[in-house]
Every structure is written in structure tokens, then in C-alpha cells.
């Protein structure tokens, strides 16, 4: 798909989502093609994907398991945001039992628990599932690096490589450099966490801008 075609589709979808047409099942075909475009081109439109899941709620006979799996996998790539949880809330009970969807839900559970080694092992056991999502592995690695960056002062180099999906030395050096960490031989120096400690009030909140696409569907 050319850049012009992709931009045209993006504008068409944006127009649909701003009107009552978002509830028209006749628009499912273009919305589903838009999901597939996101998977191929490593783009992400959470609002459009929620609209697809909502249309499946209203029109269960039009449910497409493959498209739903792509939407859920794209939501995984946006951890630690709550996209996956909100997408899961729109799934009909009858489709939650789908084997592939159950596998993706399990991936989300262990990713949320920050069990990155187990996550990597499970993904390696189902390469065909995630290979269709362009940029999937790098997006997950960004989340891993985010957690490592706020958790460790130093980490064993082999352990870090394992957490990042069993990557080789060259790829590991890329991620170490990307996050400004330091290679100290067998250890990777992350940060002096004592310098990052600040007294603050902690509140659990979800930003309104993040909920807006979901509210528009209700």
C-alpha cells in the first residue's frame, strides 16, 4: 500500500469514527482492512480498533477472530497503557473461549506480571501468531526496558538479554545504547535508583484522553 493510499484510508476511517456511521456494520470491511494495515505498517489507531470490537458486539454474526487477534496483539504493543484491558471488556463471552484469543489473554497476563522470560518463551512457541504484527517484538522490548529502567541499578548482561527475548550481543548493545545504559563487562549499569527517589503522592488514574475513544462507543 502506497503512502497516499494509506493516508486516504486513514482519513476515511477518521470520517467514519466522527459520525453515526461508526455503528454501521457496512463499514466493517474498511475498518477491518485498516486493522490489517496497522499490522503490516506498524501503525496504531486504538479508537478505530475499539470501534471494530464494538461492531462485533452489536453484530456477532460478523465476528472475525483473526481481526480480533490482531487488535489484541496491537494492544499488547502499547503496554503499560490500559488498551488491552479495555479491548478485552468489549469481547463477547462467546468469543473469549477462542483458543487463539485465550493464548493472547495469557500473554497479556504474564506481560502485566512482568514475567518477561516466560512471555518470551511463550511467544517463541507461537511465532506465526506475532509475526504478522510488524514491530511487535521491539514494542515489547520498549516496555521491558521501561520496567528495567525503573527497577534495577545494575543487571546481569545475560539476564537482560534473556528478558529482551533472548537477543544476541549486537542487538543487546543497540538497546543498551538506546536507553543510555552502560556496559560494565558482565553487568549493565542502569541507573543509581537512590538519585531517582522522590517523595510523592501516588494516585491510580486513567487519563480522560485515553478513555475518550471508549466513551464514544457507549
Swiss-Prot record:
Domain PCI positions: 44-205
One Pfam assignment: CSN8_PSD8_EIF3K
SUPFAM superfamilies in the cross-refs: ARM repeat (SSF48371), Winged helix' DNA-binding domain (SSF46785)
Location(s) in or outside the cell: Cytoplasm
GO molecular function, one term: translation initiation factor activity
Domain of life, source organism: Eukaryota
InterPro entries listed in its UniProt record: ARM-type_fold, CSN8_PSD8_EIF3K, eIF3k, PCI_dom, Transl_init_fac_sub12_N_euk, WH-like_DNA-bd_sf, WH_DNA-bd_sf
UniProt KW keywords: Cytoplasm, Initiation factor, Protein biosynthesis
Record Gene3D superfamilies: ARM repeat, domain 1 (1.25.40.250), Winged helix-like DNA-binding domain superfamily/Winged helix DNA-binding domain (1.10.10.10)
CC terms in the record's Gene Ontology section: eukaryotic 43S preinitiation complex; eukaryotic 48S preinitiation complex; eukaryotic translation initiation factor 3 complex
GO biological process, one term: formation of cytoplasmic translation initiation complex
Homology family: Belongs to the eIF-3 subunit K family.
Job description of the protein: Component of the eukaryotic translation initiation factor 3 (eIF-3) complex, which is involved in protein synthesis of a specialized repertoire of mRNAs and, together with other initiation factors, stimulates binding of mRNA and methionyl-tRNAi to the 40S ribosome. The eIF-3 complex specifically targets and initiates translation of a subset of mRNAs involved in cell proliferation.
Subunit structure: Component of the eukaryotic translation initiation factor 3 (eIF-3) complex.
Name the UniProt record assigns to this protein: Eukaryotic translation initiation factor 3 subunit K
Organism: Bombyx mori
Amino acid at each position: 500500500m502506497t503512502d497516499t493510499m494509506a493516508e486516504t484510508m486513514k482519513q476515511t476511517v477518521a470520517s467514519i469514527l466522527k459520525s453515526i456511521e461508526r455503528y454501521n456494520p457496512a463499514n466493517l470491511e474498511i475498518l477491518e482492512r485498516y486493522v490489517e494495515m496497522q499490522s503490516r505498517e506498524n501503525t496504531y489507531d486504538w479508537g478505530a480498533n475499539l470501534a471494530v470490537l464494538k461492531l462485533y458486539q452489536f453484530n456477532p454474526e460478523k465476528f472475525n477472530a483473526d481481526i480480533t487477534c490482531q487488535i489484541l496483539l496491537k494492544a499488547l504493543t502499547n503496554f503499560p497503557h490500559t488498551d488491552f484491558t479495555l479491548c478485552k471488556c468489549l469481547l463477547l463471552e462467546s468469543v473469549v473461549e477462542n483458543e487463539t484469543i485465550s493464548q493472547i489473554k495469557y500473554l497479556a497476563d504474564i506481560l502485566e506480571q512482568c514475567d518477561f522470560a516466560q512471555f518470551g518463551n511463550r511467544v517463541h512457541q507461537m511465532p506465526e501468531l506475532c509475526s504478522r504484527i510488524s514491530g511487535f517484538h521491539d514494542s515489547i522490548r520498549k516496555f521491558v526496558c521501561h520496567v528495567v529502567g525503573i527497577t534495577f541499578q545494575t543487571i546481569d548482561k545475560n539476564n537482560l538479554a534473556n528478558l529482551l527475548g533472548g537477543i544476541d550481543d549486537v542487538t543487546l548493545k543497540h538497546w543498551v545504547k538506546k536507553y543510555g545504559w552502560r556496559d560494565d563487562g558482565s553487568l549493565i549499569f542502569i541507573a543509581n535508583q537512590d538519585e531517582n527517589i522522590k517523595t510523592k503522592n501516588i494516585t491510580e488514574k486513567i487519563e480522560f484522553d485515553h478513555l475518550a475513544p471508549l466513551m464514544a462507543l457507549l
